[in-house]
Amino acid sequence: MKSVITTTISAADAAGRFPSSSDLESIQGNIQRAAARLEAAQKLSGNHEAVVKEAGDACFAKYSYLKNAGEAGDSPEKINKCYRDIDHYMRLINYSLVVGGTGPVDEWGIAGSREVYRALNLPGSAYIAAFTFTRDRLCVPRDMSSQAGVEFTSALDYVINSLC
């Protein structure tokens, strides 16, 4: 799983060198942000059901046609799968916050998702709308500290940009 630490160490090892001062500064910055990432992960874990429901509701509010016959959400089963997918991505975001890198999202979420969505006639824009709603809904300090909010929105932005 990729993180700033494992990526930095791997690059130094591949070059047959010790990590440079700038490598170590990057790792130190990552470690200093760890408390904020863990706070964001804890807040998401503690409230994930509401976050997923609100994100899914926002998706279907923006793209109400998805519930029409022949569309991606034309049955309760398909609608539940959309919420399940949003929950899956939120878990991956949580894991990424914990490890301090995008590895979980890259390895278990993004790889191949665009192709799967196209094959199943699922518009990626609907998922983007769900994650954008979650990002824009965040209220500091109501939901989490400002630094935790920065970490959470960065993780959401990574997913949003990866799905574009």
Swiss-Prot record:
(2R,3E)-phycoerythrobilin 1 binds at residues 81-82, 84, 88. Pfam families: Phycobilisome (PF00502). Light-harvesting photosynthetic tetrapyrrole chromophore-protein from the phycobiliprotein complex. InterPro entries: Globin-like_sf (IPR009050), Phycobilisome_asu/bsu (IPR012128), Phycobilisome_asu/bsu_sf (IPR038719). It comes from Griffithsia monilis. Its main location: plastid. This is R-phycoerythrin alpha chain. The keyword Glycosyltransferase does not apply. (2R,3E)-phycoerythrobilin 2 binds at residues 47, 137, 139, 142. The keyword Iron-sulfur does not apply. Belongs to the phycobiliprotein family.
